[in-house]
């Protein structure tokens, strides 16, 4: 699992990422919206870089959920049982832009957490049928 906003940022970066203090940061860092998938080797090599510096790695990831964070992505299924499910996922997953300081910010963590939770709810309850 990859933390989009690194869990090891400098104290001076808390405000730049939209956090009031260290406690505010700790309350957000492990939310579902701050996680994505990367292979262990990619995760290790990306280290504690800022979000703006991770985007190219995300674009080249084998994981579509990680690609879409960095660039728009569509997966079209024209017919079949999974058409509505794929359309739901495409509609709910968004591309994100670093804040003015290059971070995946507190606001983006909150937004993406809500979006991921909504998508999971709709998938698990089959609300897309």
State where each predicted segment sits.
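Flexible coil/loop and intrinsically disordered segments
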Residues: 1-129
